[in-house]
Regions:
Chain A
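Extended, low-polarity segments enriched in aliphatic/aromatic residues
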Residues: 2-80, 85-315
Length: 315, 498
């Protein structure tokens, strides 16, 4: 049973600002005490595609980076991998950094060293097994900034996802931590942009979800389980950050949830999003439910965590 | 870009993280060599432009002259509109003071962008070099770069470590032309660029004697793997060959006050201090220089270099430079040497000694060997700086300064470079002296089209801040002091008693 902590958006005040809430979440989760001085911590974040306008504000991530700096006396690494758009041509590290910069993300604003997970090419990493012989992938190549760190905290901007239902801890802590060519392999020909009218079939989608979650097993293997997840339920848009556009969020922002169990965390997160969706966003949320159900059940079956959870809500 | 030719990984046979071996990596790698690579100069001496370090008006600002040279040397023709243009610089070691000022780099970035290129600033990770190195680890290197003022905010373009988080994001380049090396590895942010402008701080170097644009290619563009190869790691037998540290009988063992630093200087724990002397495990050594440099920096003599190591390394780094040049079509790389703060040692040193000569100026060319030769000649012709190591060693105007200061002539590198097709040592130097005209004065200003005074005129028209508080308060003051007393403070005569 996974334990999830939720710091909601109630009682906002001068001593309970968003920053206070994020700091409290980390304290209550007990993760800061587990950081040794000198530990190299990587914070996996989302850097939105050009045209996506609901990315997290840098201060939300900086708050965590500063907490890590205080605990480890080291400047943490913040990272994200190259996006999937036109992978072989447009997605060079330089244009990726240009887009990142335009979103307001830099080492200055984020409070740590921002790097591309996988280097300029997006392909720098190491191969780790995903589990036993019955896995589809066998092993995956995890990006260098993630797999060469002592610990990884996945700071996920929660959104809906056209292929996986929801982009939260499971997606950002797994598929999104892989090197570029590995993600191409996991996609196996699936077009991640269904708005182009190329919606894959049910069977292809199920296969992709399974492979993406196996990728998460590889990441956990790389970090020997030293992974912590924070879901930012903030501006939950129908599109994920790799889309070149974004519609209005499906409901009001609900705060921040954290856990060491990505399955429990995503399960709670989707429940919270569904319960608080605005009338205009409900259709999008409900249309994602089936995919989320499959995502969570496969993740649980693979041993990534438990859908059963205890929730501690802090206001 | 073509797909890599490699055997599929046998995923289901994996039981643990894969430790890549040479065979595995080379199969994964592919060769980015361009079909039309080659030295820029096909015949005769290569044109090199030079602007000296003097400045007395707007047009003679070193930054303005750097921009002038960019166009005079036709570096703007190295790339097309829309090209990804790598701006290769050295990010500088932590506590290094003699690095290029960010303004020189920003100036070139601005012009690359103005010409339609997409610039990004790059440098590769280094090997460990010494115990407190900040450049071997990409996140440390970026902290150092920011400390030197090299940021995306300063340059208004991405600032990237070219070979990735761990220095493994690279391409293998084959070098059949090499005099020593037959392959090397280039950081991908360099190798994948459409064009490159190399901006080098021209100064000395402890291994290659001198470091300018060729050094930026021959070491600066090499990934970690490329640097190991260029260091000639593991050439010959450990006990008598050049590609290994040389352990002398001068190591005092644990009596050395630096012995703990010495033990910690190796990232592979390839040596250990004993009560008397050291124990060395050559099978662990990769020749990163850490033990040698840490020992030398500490003023000790227990670990050093083979005597013939240096000229061999100089030739090897010319080979490696060719590896970087081969990643570009002919004429797609432009070179700038900034002979400013011409100190005896490399920017990877965590300090800077006194300059061996006064600032010389800026040089630019599309032929890197000609540019290096011209830079060396101008440095040699410059006066020797008082109090510098050059003066200490008896260097005279016209001497080969870096040979006197560092031991071997950098012309060894240039001869090797010319031999393998990096360029020509013959050059034709054009001394660029900007003419002071209203157009030239305005050309490189922050707002060339609108003088600041005109802008302020508009501002003052709306709100004249001075008028609001005028007249300023004036009170009686000691006129004797203001009119006469200060004249008595002649620094050469001293303040009069009483």
């Amino acid at each position: 049973m996974g334990e999830v902590i939720w710091v909601d958006m109630q009682a906002i005040g001068p001593e309970n600002s968003v920053g206070h809430k994020i700091r409290r979440l980390l304290q209550e989760a007990g993760v800061l005490g587990g950081l040794d001085a000198g530990a190299r911590v990587a914070l996996k974040i989302n850097t939105a595609e050009e045209g996506y306008e609901y990315g997290l504000r840098p201060a939300f991530l900086r708050t965590v980076a500063e907490a890590v700096t205080n605990a480890t006396e080291q400047i943490p690494t913040l990272c994200d991998g190259l996006k999937l758009v036109d992978y072989w041509r447009r997605m060079s590290g330089s244009s990726f950094m240009d887009v990142v910069s335009r979103q307001g993300y830099s080492s200055d604003t984020l409070g740590g060293n921002f790097v591309i997970n996988g280097g300029f090419s997006g392909d720098e990493g190491n191969i780790y097994p995903c589990g036993g012989a019955d896995t589809v992938l066998g092993g995956v190549e995890v990006g260098a900034a993630v797999c060469r760190s002592d610990r990884v905290w996945v700071l996920a901007h929660v959104t809906l996802h056209p292929l996986l239902g929801v982009a939260g801890a499971l997606v950002n802590g797994g598929f999104e931590c892989l090197v570029g060519r590995e993600r191409t392999r996991v996609l196996a020909g699936i077009d991640p942009y269904p708005f182009n009218g190329s919606r894959p079939g049910r069977s292809a989608l199920s296969g992709f979800r399974h492979r993406a979650l196996e990728g998460h097993l590889g990441v956990r293997q790389a970090l020997e389980g030293r992974v912590f997840y924070v879901n930012y339920v903030w501006d939950v848009t129908p599109q994920p950050e790799y889309f070149p556009f974004s519609e209005a969020p499906v409901g009001p922002s609900q705060g921040f949830l954290a856990s060491r169990d990505p399955v429990a965390l995503d399960a709670v997160t989707f429940d919270v999003v569904a319960e608080t969706a605005s009338p205009g966003g409900r259709t999008a949320v409900e249309s994602a439910r089936e995919a989320v159900e499959e995502l969570l059940s496969v993740a649980e079956a693979l041993g990534l965590g438990s859908r059963t959870y205890t929730l501690r809500r802090l206001s | 870009m073509s797909e890599p030719k490699c055997e599929p990984t046998k995923w289901h046979e994996l039981t643990a993280p894969v430790v890549g071996d040479r065979e595995h990596y080379q199969k994964k790698s592919w060769n980015p060599v361009k079909h039309t690579w080659g030295p820029y100069t096909q015949k005769g001496p290569a044109p090199v432009w030079f602007a000296d370090a003097n400045a007395t008006n707007w047009t003679e600002s070193m930054i303005a002259k750097t921009k002038d040279l960019f166009y005079e040397a036709k570096l703007n023709e190295c790339f097309e509109k829309g090209d990804e243009v790598a701006i290769k610089i050295h990010y500088g070691e932590w506590n290094r003071t003699a690095v290029l000022r960010p303004e020189y780099i920003a100036a070139i970035v601005e012009e690359v962008r103005a010409c339609g290129g997409h610039p990004y600033v790059v440098n590769d990770t280094t090997l460990s070099y010494h115990i407190f190195n900040s450049m071997a680890y990409s996140s440390y290197q970026m902290e150092g770069a920011i400390r030197h003022g090299y940021t995306s905010a300063t340059f208004k373009c991405p600032v990237i470590v070219a070979d990735g988080f761990s220095g493994e994001d690279d391409y293998r380049v084959e070098l059949p032309e090499g005099l020593i090396l037959k392959e090397t590895y280039i950081g991908r942010a360099v190798a994948e660029a459409d064009a490159m402008i190399v901006i080098a701080h021209a100064r000395g170097h402890a291994i290659t004697m001198y470091g300018g644009v060729l050094k930026q290619l021959g070491i600066g563009c090499q990934s970690k793997r490329g640097k190991y190869i260029t260091h000639l790691a593991h050439w010959g037998d450990p006990h008598d060959a050049i590609g290994w540290p040389k352990f002398t009988d001068q190591c005092p063992g644990k009596a050395c006050k630096f012995h703990e630093m010495c033990d910690n200087s190796c990232p592979r724990q390839a040596h250990r201090v004993l009560e008397h002397g050291k124990e060395w495990y050559p099978e662990r050594c990769r020749l990163c220089y850490s033990c040698q440099v840490t020992c030398i920096f500490s003023g000790m003599g227990g670990i050093t270099f083979e005597e013939n190591y240096f000229p061999n390394a100089m030739i090897a780094h010319a080979d490696a430079a060719l590896g970087a040049l081969k990643c570009f079509e002919r004429g797609k790389v432009g070179f700038i040497n900034c002979a400013i703060d011409v100190v005896p040692e490399c920017d990877c040193f965590p300090w800077a000694n006194k300059a061996i000569c006064p600032d010389v100026g800026i040089l630019a060319s599309k032929d890197l060997v000609a540019l290096e030769e011209a830079t060396l000649d101008l440095i040699d012709q410059a006066p020797v700086s008082p109090g510098s190591v050059a003066e200490e060693k008896g260097c005279k105007v016209g001497d080969d300064k870096f040979r006197v200061v560092n031991g071997f002539s950098p012309r060894i590198t240039m001869a090797a470079a010319e031999k393998i097709g990096l360029g020509t040592r013959q050059y034709q130097l054009t001394h660029h002296e900007p003419v002071l005209t209203p157009e030239n004065a305005a050309k490189w200003q922050i707002r060339p089209d609108q003088p600041t005074t005109v802008r302020l005129r508009e501002t003052f028209h709306r709100n004249d801040l001075a008028t609001e508080v005028m007249p300023f308060r004036r009170e009686a003051y000691n006129k004797e002091w203001v009119w006469n007393e200060w004249k008595k403070f002649d620094p050469f005569k001293g303040e009069p008693a009483g």
